[in-house]
């Protein structure tokens, strides 16, 4: 009774799924791309070679550390990910990186498929990275759990197409490149979905996106992602800025079209929000300079920072601004709640399943700069009420930890027959 789980990355939700299977006593292996291994001579040599071109490969490898399952259960097929990193270092607009990503992900899938055998009791797969493996597993009579972190791709692409049609200045060569290839990628995801025994989604928002595309929502089970360990309650409640200081909002993650960044810029410009509020943006900027510049007063682009530093900024900020147009969950929300930070988000965020408006955050319309401005002004005028949300925000994270996610996922996999002999 053993399950093989595979994904080219070591993302937190992937590792937590692997840990759930391991804790249930059914993990045969977790197959991934690059896995940080300080004992590896190859990795040490690669790090040294990268220094010659002033590239901190060691930092990239440390971000790919597997922490949730024993090392002897982890298998690594790293060449594709190394190639993607190398190309990404030289790529100016993302198209070459996207090309390499697609082809190396398919190669990874084929390698995993080739290693399947009848001694397994099931396979845990992820979207777009698993068609060959799912096909092989079903031929062997193995049940397959298929994890879809994001909403159905036709739905997502329609949102992006609408935004670039309404705001042509948002379009980039990367957007045009990926849009031209999306039909075949959608077909691949649909084939994976239909062949799977059970589909795992992180939110009701994601589950609802499937039926309009002709995909059966009856096979979908919703298992929300867990929150990180919570800060001490007194530290969380006492966080934020004093009332005499400017309101400080935080943005975590890519500053992009899909996340609604262009609406934030418009809200700051037209509403002159920078007079009394700051927005600290932590993450890469994926909007064209012609959209971002000149940067509105009050918005500060801080770039990417180490996780510990970001978590402290969650604690010392007044609210998280997460006006996404389409997000299967949005782990930035649970990260924020774990530090007592109220969340301002939309009904197009899967994490809104856990949001109680006026209690642990605020719910706004997606794609509406006026709604963003109105809610920022509400925060400015109601600092006491906003601060009072911190205790409820902390309680939200404490009530649904990763252990709760793993427990629910284990139940789903058992019901789907992946743990049967």
Predicted regions mapped to residue ranges:
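Conserved donor-binding/catalytic core segment of Leloir-type glycosyltransferases
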Residues: 236, 240-259, 265-269, 280
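Short alpha-helical donor nucleotide-sugar binding micro-motif in glycosyltransferases
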Residues: 193, 312-317
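A short, well-ordered alpha-helix in the C-terminal region of glycosyltransferases
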Residues: 385-399
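Conserved acidic donor-binding segment of nucleotide-sugar-dependent glycosyltransferases
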Residues: 357-358, 362-368, 378-383
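Nucleotide-activated donor-binding/catalytic signature segment of Leloir-type glycosyltransferases, i.e.
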Residues: 289-311
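Acceptor-binding helix/loop patch of EC 2.4 sugar-transfer enzymes
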Residues: 46, 77-100, 140-187
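Short hydrophobic beta-strand element within catalytic cores of glycosyltransferases
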Residues: 342-345
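Aromatic "clamp/platform" in nucleotide-sugar-dependent glycosyltransferases that forms part
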Residues: 325
